From Swiss-Prot:
Disruption phenotype: Development up until embryonic stage 9.5 dpc is normal. After this point, mortality rates increase rapidly with less than 5% survival at stage 12.5 dpc. The yolk sac endoderm is abnormally thin with fewer mitotic cells. In addition there are fewer blood islands in the yolk sac, associated with impaired hematopoiesis. Expression of many miRNA-regulated genes in the yolk sac is abnormal, and in particular there is marked derepression of genes involved in regulation of apoptosis and the cell cycle. miRNA biogenesis is not affected. Signal peptide: none annotated. Residues 1-917 are annotated as: Interaction with argonaute family proteins. Residues 1-21, 39-57, 665-683, 723-733 have a biased composition (Basic and acidic residues). The modification Phosphoserine is found at residues 724, 863, 976, 1197, 1255, 1520, 1804, 1825. The modification Phosphothreonine is found at residue 1406. Residues 396-410, 417-429, 444-461, 591-617, 635-647, 703-722, 738-766, 876-906, 924-937, 1033-1042, 1054-1064, 1082-1105 have a biased composition (Polar residues). It comes from Mus musculus (Mouse). Residues 1-137, 159-209, 222-250, 257-276, 396-461, 548-683, 703-998, 1011-1126, 1143-1182, 1234-1256, 1273-1306, 1360-1395, 1512-1570, 1659-1685 are annotated as: Disordered. Residues 125-137 have a biased composition (Basic residues). This is Trinucleotide repeat-containing gene 6A protein. The lineage of its organism: Eukaryota, Metazoa, Chordata, Craniata, Vertebrata. Residues 573-584 have a biased composition (Gly residues). GO terms for molecular function: molecular adaptor activity; RNA binding. Residues 255-331, 303-384, 325-424, 394-480, 487-736, 1059-1129, 1605-1896 are annotated as: Sufficient for interaction with AGO2.
Length: 1896
């Protein structure tokens, strides 16, 4: 291995040398140019640096003259880092291979030149910190630097710390490659030091040991917290050379290095590994190390890194602690990361938690914030990346790391364990880049990467790229990654990278090559240049890196794919994760990382932060730090932001180049001089970019990514215009967002602190710091912006300036606009800052467009936009994400959370509320609120626009405009005009792009020009939202999105506002949409980016056009974005409707399909959205719009369909022509799906749609409930829904058909209601209905849809074909319009699937004739798409989960789709459902359970006969459990599906339900607890009854249960909240809900209850209580009671509901199966048994009186049924003591069970008999629990089923706490669990828990 590694390393080094040589020439020129500037600035910075940190000087020499160590040296370097001085020498002494040496030396020489720049770039403070750490570690780093050469130069430029960083990362790579490598590294680099540093490397036992010991000690000592304090210990041992301050600084760096290097397996692994890290980590994050370096979780040195960051020691002890925490958080998160998905999640979560923590850490770093920032960034990035790098990397390796990075992780995770390791290295490169961004770290990282690259190349060339790639998403392209990895990697890396111009490509290649690039690109040269690029890339990866990745991925070609994923990952996925890494800041990570980080970090950080931390700024910065720093660093520091902007704008690739070393350099450069930067950027970037495939392949995309279309270059130029911050910023405009972003990022004001030290530079990182500026920019922004930002970061400022700086101006606008955002700035700082930052950065990344676009585009470009979005989404979204999740995952949560708080806090602090909320708020629903929100925000941002007012306000300044716009939901109207304007702008947009000045911020709009109206804006918003929440928000928010970024945005915003037009504009948008639409089609998918290749390709092709067109095209992808924008707009319009939705959708959608969809849908979708949104939002326009839209769509049914179809095709882009078919094909084929995947991140195709749908449909709920996974889930949900939606679409398309399709029962009786209700789901008619209704309608629709799915799918497919034929003819804009319409239609379908609103409403009118078509189409669509989508959906599951959070919100579609798609056996699941493979389904459901609580289990499980029905129902249930399940009527009504059929006859109160007669739990083999649950209402009842029947032999039990179910359904409907398991919950959840519902109104329940429950009307049911289930019936008493706590809590309902739900006694038992047994439930331990017995005896002699108070139940046996009945009537709802007794009839079976259980199981057994029934119920529940996993969650306690299932499934909620005993004991005691004493247990009863459970 070592040999291979050595070989690979050598090869890589040679390649790198060559590359470096080549690039050096370029770089030399550039650097020479920059050198002067740098020197000048450096002189100033040096002063600052010196003042801040003395170490840098010490380090610089070493670094400056580091000999190119072998990759192996990297480790030692890393190790060395601990003792920089010595090590540096040692490392330096280690001669790299001659080839390497020379190039490296050359680069080093150059680097020194660069260094000045870097310092300028990175605020001295950061620089110093990093330097310190780096220096110490830098000892080796220098070696690495040598290896990196260029990187080193960069490092040098950055400062020694950078060098160190670079070197270490190389180590990392190497180490990652293998421990041997580490050893080698150690050996190579003064092993003693190295080991020490490395910790992991044992060869250098003394040092290593010392470090380890120190680290361990520290860890043990909780050095983490005191890491800084302990650092010294470490420092002495591990960091001899480090001075305390140096130690700290270095520590950070070291940590970073370590993280990177240490990150290597060993390093990371060992705490020691963290040794170096330790030091680094220790100092910073010993904790990390501690973590096991974190390693465990941090595993990835995330922790370490993070810690490091934290520990940048600025906030030495406290920080570290924080760090620790954070670290831990990271750790934890990291763990997740390790976990893999978690990467994304991690990113999201981690990012959130961790990242933020990280950030915090970073903050802690504070000192290094400048460099630390870098470091942090790096670290953060690094962490993200490093972690990526690291070994966690090693472990999850890339995955993990990436995981950390999240996305990458995601991506990579599996992919490269081994590979990944390297990958991480790669990631480290990313990190490096990041560092670069940050200065040091990036470089450092870069170095690492190169080494890594080398190593990776050696070890895993594939890995590396994989890493990167993988990381990059290579995983998605793992395939690619492999190829890329191995081959490409190396080659790419080397060659391509080289090729790439690698840098440029670097982006492109980079990703692919990344490693190789690094590696190959001779460490020195490649590093230098590549590093530049690469570095940049990594940084970007962080920020750009990912992008780079994108580029990279893309760049190589990879860019597209890889990028997509990679980028996607980073952006999208990565994003999610990395995007986390790469832009982790940007995309996802911003989403994740960024998001998390940013979000969280932002959120958290800011809030937390460490901002406060010593490095307040730091903290904040970090906070932003991540975003900011990270982003900034990544972006900014690296100039990436700017550069990225530029680069992004340029191409991302460009940035890469520019931004890699360039980044570094560029950063430096930027710092040095914008012009130079620009020049360089232009030169390097352009040269590289252009030179590189990047340019060619990537270029369009990159350009697109840049969101600048071709113009991007111009934009670049504009960027170039950068000169004045303003100018630049203006240029930044679109970029601005970017710029802003950077700024924003910087904004993160916390950074300001960082900055504080110098800040401005720090600005860069600091720049973030500059957040002060941010603040400034918030407040001062202008000045800062200009001066401050720009100045502030002079270079960095510049960068930022560029980014922010310009932005600043803009920001000013922002500022102004946002002014505050000043808060933004200020408080926002993060808020905005991050918004912007992230957003911006993102935005930047997105460049707003870029991101947005890129986001989308980039994303797209990596598809990731989507991903990014996803990432954003989420993450998370999708991530986000997941943003991730985020995301979200992201992610969402992270984002969400993060954002949320963040928002609150960080994001905008100021907006904080708003923003957070603002974004958040608005977004709030969304979760990520931030991002999700962002997405939401889009809603927020976007929404903010809608909501935005506040958010806008939140946006503060910006928002102000936004608010105006925001004001808008109506505001959209204003935009409407603008929309019109925009429309022209759209055309213009492209043009405008060229001439941003034209729009000045219109530019941004311009960007958005794509969004014709709010399109651009929205787009941006979306993008921005996503990207830049700030931008978006600002934009969106600010300008309503409309405002655009700032005022400028605002102006555009207006256009955005146009969104109103949005709808009106819709037409236009359609126009536009088509405009971009075409592009959408082309671009759209270019946008797809999901298809990305195609799309982007298309895009590219189209791009120009699109770009031209849009930018349309370009933006087209944006369409996703746009759509996002649209969506967003829509969101906004929707009033935030969708903020999520929009955004989410957008995001999700963003991902191309949606994008497509959105795009078109943007029109249609938007309209729909709007309809929905309006409805939902109740926005004025929406209603109006909706009707028109409905009409329109009806009229255009074709169009509507078309868009939908397009969406479906996901290829709107593709051919514009009906890609729908294609999409189906594509979906069928993974291509599209892959595309989707990329786009969505996971089954993007599915997800996005779902997202959209869910967002839309669920949005309200979603926002409320599940914003969280808006992206992920949303996407997934949307997609699946999309899948389903197509059916809806057909509905939409053939409205009459839909109607015809819809069974008369459903439509006729309900059309109005159901439509209306659907509308609510849709949001279009939403205003008319409450969530409950909507949920019910949703379910109906879903039932319809599900049942019709096959038909619809078939039909859809047919229609799509027809439409595509139709559309195809009009290929081109009109076609696009049509396609857009089809997209819209499709989206609508999707929406309708969710909503069935238009479907029912509009489509219901569709002649039946189409029905058949639809069904088949749907079916084929599902089959085709779903199956293919399945894997993705499976990926999307988490999204589903998110949806699960809001099960109801998920529509059936979501559930169904999710189940079908997301769930692992999507199609088969469908089939299973169809086939009613209960177990299978259940299992599936279990799997899904987390996805969709309801749908999982009960959903399809139930009965084949009703499968369609059930399927629908379940699906519906989950999606809109209330209607469907609870009432069941929705099912009944909505049996639209032919299968659904007649739905079991509606229950009529008083009569036994006749539904599912065929299913007799007793006899039905399929009946399982889950199965029962499947048909919640009916089935469940029945099944429950059957269960009961099984026990009792009577079906009354089941019936009894059912009412609950039914009721639940209702309840659920009511409680939309509980939605998750509508099916699953129906029993359980229902119980819970039922309680609520019933409590509140059990009328329906009652009837249903009677029927379902078969509650003998005569017994209790007949009685007044009969209406509601008896238990619930006692609504009055129980009502309060139930309602009280248990009810809702679950405990409550658990109590009564569960109790009665089993209904065993009351309902069922009573009826038919009345035995002589009476079960008294809901007893509390306080009940006096004797009194109870006396009461019971009043009705007759008691043959048996078994009191099981622990379970809250008692079994009473009378001698006759008459007595039992009498007793039941008397006792039921009898208030005894503090409880209301629920008396139910129990069957003998139940009784036996009850006793058996009481004996065998927990107290539950007492109730066993009852339990029997309940067990059934429980079964149901159980099943539901799966189903309801979410619910379970939601349910937590309430999740009866959760409990059951939990037990069974481990749904931990219930844990099987068995509340039984306790829970049962006091029903209320466990509100969460079924307080009802016995119900749960009864439900869970042994039978079910044991037997039932088993059966489950």
């Amino acid at each position: 291995m070592r040999e291979l590694e050595a070989k690979a390393t050598k090869d890589v080094e040679r390649n790198l040398s060559r590359d470096l040589v080549q690039e050096e020439e370029q770089l030399m020129e550039e650097k020479k140019k920059k050198k002067d500037d740098k020197k000048k600035k450096e002189a100033a910075q040096k002063k600052a640096t010196e003042q801040k940190i003395k170490v840098p000087e010490q380090i610089k020499p070493s670094v400056s003259q580091p000999q190119p160590a072998n990759s192996d040296n990297g480790t030692s370097t890393a190790t060395s880092t601990n003792n920089n001085a010595k090590r540096a020498t040692a490392s330096n002494q280690q001669p790299p291979p001659p080839q390497q040496q020379q190039p490296q030396q050359e680069q080093q020489q150059q680097q020194p030149q660069a260094l000045p720049r870097y310092p300028r770039e990175v605020p001295p403070r950061f620089r110093h910190q990093e330097h310190k750490q780096l220096l110490k570690r830098g000892q080796h780093f220098p070696v690495i630097a040598a290896n990196l050469g260029s990187a080193v130069k960069v490092l040098n430029s950055q400062s020694e710390s950078s060098a160190v960083t670079n070197q270490q990362p190389q180590n990392n790579g190497e180490v990652q490659n293998s421990k041997s490598q580490s050893d080698i590294n150690h050996n190579t680099s003064g092993s003693h030091y190295e080991n020490c540093q490395r910790g992991p490397v044992s060869s250098t036992s003394d040092c290593s040991t010392s470090c380890k010991n120190a680290v361990n000690d520290l860890l043990e000592k909780e050095a983490w917290p005191s890491a800084p304090g302990s650092d010294p210990e470490l420092a002495p041992e591990c960091i001899d050379a480090d001075s305390a301050s140096n130690s700290e600084s270095e520590r950070n760096i070291t940590v970073m290095a370590s993280g990177n290097t240490g990150g290597e397996k060993d390093g990371l692994r060992n705490s020691t590994g963290l040794g170096s890290q330790s030091k680094f980590v220790v100092g910073s994050s010993s904790n990390n190390v501690g973590h096991g370096s974190s390693t465990g979780p941090w595993g990835f040195p995330h922790g370490a890194l993070i810690s490091t960051c934290q520990v940048s020691v600025d906030a030495p002890e406290s920080k570290p602690e924080s760090s620790n925490n954070r670290m831990n958080a990271w750790g934890t998160v990291s763990s997740s990361s390790n976990g893999g998905l978690n990467p994304s999640t991690l990113n999201s979560a981690s990012n959130h938690g961790a990242w933020p923590v990280l950030e915090n850490n970073g903050l802690a770093l504070k000192g290094p914030v400048g460099s630390g920032s870098s470091g942090i960034n790096i670290q953060c990035s690094t962490i993200g990346q490093m972690p990526n790098n690291q070994n966690i990397n090693s472990k999850v390796s890339g995955s993990s790391t990436h995981g950390t990075w999240g996305s990458l992780q995601e991506t990579c995770e599996p992919e490269v364990s081994g590979t990944q390791k390297v990958s991480f290295s790669g990631q480290p490169q990313n990190i490096t880049t990041e560092t670069t961004g940050p200065n040091n770290t990036t470089n450092f990282m870069t170095s690492s990467l190169p080494n890594s690259g080398s190593v990776q190349n050696n070890e895993l060339p594939t890995s590396n790229p994989g890493a990167w790639r993988v990381s990059t998403m290579n995983h998605p392209q793992i395939q690619a990654p492999s190829v890329m990895n191995g081959t490409s990697l190396s080659h790419l890396s080397n060659g391509e990278s080289k090729t790439g111009g690698s840098y440029g490509t670097t982006w492109g290649a980079y990703g692919s090559n990344y490693s190789g690039d690094k590696c190959a690109g001779p460490n020195g040269q490649a590093n230098g240049d590549t590093v530049n690029a690469t570095l940049m890339q990594p940084g970007i990866n962080g920020p750009m890196g990912t992008n780079f990745q994108v580029n990279t991925n893309k760049g190589g070609g990879v860019w597209e794919p890889g990028t997509v994923n990679s980028q996607s990952s980073p952006w999208g996925s990565g994003n999610g994760a990395n995007s986390g890494g790469s832009r982790r800041g940007w995309g996802s990570p911003a989403q994740n990382t960024g998001t998390g980080l940013s979000s969280v970090e932002w959120n958290k950080l800011p809030s937390n932060q460490h901002s406060n931390d010593s490095a307040n700024g730091n903290g904040k910065k970090l906070t932003n730090g991540w975003k900011s720093t990270e982003e900034d660093d990544q972006g900014s520091a690296t100039s990436q932001t700017n550069e990225q902007n530029s680069v992004w704008a340029k191409a991302g690739g460009t940035v890469e180049s520019d931004g890699s070393a360039e980044s570094t350099g560029r950063l430096e450069e930027k710092v040095t001089g914008e012009s130079q930067s620009r020049d360089r950027r232009k030169i390097d970037q352009h040269t590289l970019l252009q030179s590189i495939v990047n340019r060619t392949d990537l270029d369009p995309r990159v350009l697109s990514n840049s969101g600048w279309g071709q113009t991007p270059i111009k934009q670049n130029t504009a960027w170039d215009t950068e000169t004045s911050p303003r100018g630049e910023r203006k240029t930044d405009n679109g970029t601005e967002a970017w710029g802003s972003s950077a700024t924003q990022t910087f904004n993160s004001g916390a950074c300001t602190d960082k900055t504080s030290p110098n800040s401005n530079d720090t600005s860069s990182v600091s720049g973030w710091g500059d957040p002060k500026p941010t603040l400034r920019w918030g407040d001062s922004k202008g000045s800062n912006c200009q001066g401050g930002w720009e100045d502030d970061s002079a270079a960095t400022g510049m960068i930022k300036s560029n980014q922010w700086g310009g932005c600043k101006e803009d920001k000013s606008t922002w500022n102004d606009s946002q002014k505050s955002k000043q808060g933004w700035g200020d408080g926002q700082k993060s808020s905005q800052g991050w918004s912007i930052s992230a957003g911006d950065n993102w935005g930047e990344s997105s460049r707003s467009n870029h991101w947005g676009e890129a986001n989308k585009k980039s994303s797209s470009g990596g598809s990731d936009s989507d991903r990014s979005i996803s990432g954003w989404n989420e993450l998370g979204k999708t991530s986000s994400f997941t943003w991730g999740n985020n995301i979200n995952p992201n992610n969402s949560s992270g984002w969400d959370e993060s954002s949320k708080p963040n928002s609150s806090q960080g994001w905008g602090d100021p907006p904080k509320c708003n923003q957070s909320l603002g974004w958040g708020d608005s977004s709030k629903p969304v979760s990520s609120p931030d991002w999700n929100k962002q997405q939401d925000i889009v809603g927020s941002w976007g929404i903010p626009p809608a909501t935005s007012k506040p958010p806008g306000t939140g946006w503060l300044g910006g928002p102000i405009p936004a608010p105006a716009k925001e004001e808008e939901p109506t505001g959209w109207e204003e935009p409407s005009p603008e929309s019109i304007r925009r429309k022209m702008e759209i055309d213009d947009g492209t043009s405008a792009w060229g001439d941003p000045s034209k729009y000045n911020y219109k530019n941004v709009n311009m960007w958005n020009k794509n969004i014709p109206e709010a399109s651009g804006r929205s787009d941006q918003q979306a993008q921005m939202h996503r990207l830049l929440p700030a931008a978006s928000a600002v934009s969106s928010k600010e300008t309503s999105s409309g405002s655009g970024w700032g005022e400028p945005w605002a102006e555009p915003s207006t256009p955005a506002t146009t969104v109103d037009n949005g709808t009106s504009a819709w037409g236009k948008p359609i126009d536009s949409g088509p405009s971009w639409g075409e592009p959408i089609t082309a671009a759209s998918n270019a946008s797809t980016w999901g298809s990305s290749s195609v799309g982007p390709q298309s895009l590219s092709k189209s791009g120009p056009k699109s770009m031209q067109d849009g930018w349309c095209g370009d933006d087209m992808p944006l369409p996703g974005s746009r759509p996002t924008g649209w969506e967003e707009e829509e969101d906004v319009e929707i009033g935030m409707w969708n903020s999520n939705s929009s955004q989410e959708l957008n995001s999700s959608l963003n991902w191309p399909p949606y994008t497509k969809k959105m795009s078109s849908k943007g029109l249609s979708g938007k309209k729909r959205r709007r309809e929905r949104g309006m409805m939902k939002g109740g926005n004025k326009q929406e209603d109006a719009w909706i009707n028109p839209f409905v009409k329109q769509f009806s009229n255009i049914s074709f169009s509507r369909d078309s868009p939908e179809e397009n969406v479906q095709s996901n290829k709107m882009d593709l051919s514009g022509g009906m890609l729908q078919d294609k999409r189906m094909e594509i979906d069928k084929h993974s291509l599209n799906i892959g595309d989707y995947n990329r786009t969505v991140g996971k089954g993007p195709g599915s997800r996005p749609q779902i997202s959209k749908e869910s967002s839309m449909e669920r949005n309200p709920y979603f926002d409320k409930n599940g914003n969280p996974n808006m992206f992920g889930v949303g996407n997934t949900a949307a997609q699946p829904r999309g899948m389903q939606q197509p059916p809806a679409q057909p509905l939409s398309s053939s409205q009459p058909n839909l109607r015809a399709q819809v069974p008369p029962p459903l439509l006729s009786p309900q059309v109005p209601v159901s439509l209306l209700k659907y509308a609510p789901n849709n949001g279009g008619l939403n205003p008319l209905f409450g969530p409950q209704q909507v949920a019910m309608l949703n379910q109906l629709s879903q039932l319809n849809q599900l049942s019709q799915i096959s038909q619809l799918q078939r039909l859809l497919a047919q229609q799509q074909r027809a439409q595509s034929q139709r559309s195809a003819p009009s290929a081109n804009r009109q076609q696009q319009d049509q396609q857009g319409r089809p997209l819209s239609v499709q989206q609508q379908m999707m929406q309708q699937s969710r909503q069935l609103d238009p479907s029912l409403l509009v489509k219901q009118q569709t002649p039946p004739s189409q029905q058949p078509l639809h069904q088949p189409a749907m079916k084929s669509f599902l089959d085709n798409v779903m199956p293919h989508t399945t894997p993705e959906l499976q990926k999307g599951p988490s999204p589903v989960n998110a949806f699960s959070n809001f099960p109801i919100g998920l529509n059936s579609n979501l559930n169904v789709n999710m189940d079908m798609n997301s769930i692992k056996e999507p199609q088969s699941r469908l089939r299973k459902w169809t086939t009613v493979d209960s177990m299978s389904v259940n299992t599936s459901l279990d799997q899904n359970s987390s996805k969709h609580g309801a749908i999982s289990s009960g959903f399809r499980l139930e009965e084949s006969p009703f499968v369609p029905y059930d399927f629908m129902n379940s699906s519906t249930s989950p999606a809109s459990p209330p209607g469907s399940i609870g009432d069941g009527w929705p099912r009944a009504k909505s049996p639209n599906g032919s299968s659904s059929v007649n739905w079991p006859p509606e229950f009529r109160p008083g009569e036994p339900w006749k539904g599912y007669p065929n299913i007799d739990p007793e006899t039905d083999p399929y009946v399982t607890p889950g199965s029962v649950i499947n048909s919640l209402s009916i089935n469940t009842v029945r099944e429950v009854d059957h269960l009961r029947d099984r026990n009792s032999g009577s079906s009354s039990s089941l019936n009894t249960t059912l009412p609950s179910t039914s009721a639940w359904s209702s309840i659920r409907a009511s409680n939309y909240n509980v939605p998750l398991s509508s099916t699953a919950q129906s029993t359980s959840a229902r119980n819970s809900d039922s309680k609520l519902t019933w409590s509140p109104g059990s009328v329906t329940n009652t009837s249903l209850a009677h029927e379902l429950w078969k509650v003998p009307l005569p017994p209790k049911n007949i009685t007044a209580p009969s209406r509601p289930p008896p238990g619930l019936t006692g609504q009055k008493p129980p009502l309060s009671t139930w309602d009280n706590s248990p009810l809702r809590v679950g405990g409550g309902w658990g109590n009564s509901d569960a109790r009665y739900t089993p209904g065993s006694s009351w309902g069922e038992s009573s009826s038919g199966r009345i035995t002589n047994w009476l079960v008294l439930k809901n007893l509390t331990p306080q009940i006096d048994g004797s009194t109870l017995r006396t009461l019971c005896m009043q009705h007759g002699p008691l043959i048996t009186f078994h009191l099981n108070l622990p379970h809250g139940n008692a079994l009473v046996r009378y001698s006759s049924k008459e007595e039992v009945v009498k007793a039941q009537k008397s006792l039921h709802m009898c208030v005894l003591g503090n409880t209301t007794i629920l008396a139910e009839f129990a069957s003998e079976e139940e009784i036996s069970r009850f006793f058996a259980q009481s004996q065998s199981l927990t107290p539950s057994p007492g109730w066993q008999s009852l339990g029997s029934s309940q067990s059934r119920l429980g079964s149901l529940d159980c099943s539901h629990s799966f189903s309801s996993r979410t619910d379970v969650n939601h349910w937590n306690g309430a999740g009866l089923s959760g409990a059951n299932c939990g037990d069974l499934h481990g749904t931990s909620l219930w844990g099987t706490p068995h509340y039984s005993t306790s829970l049962w004991g006091p029903p209320s005691s466990d509100p969460r669990g079924i307080s009802s004493p016995s119900p749960i247990n009864a439900f869970l009863s042994v039978d079910h828990l044991g037997g039932g459970g088993e059966s489950m």
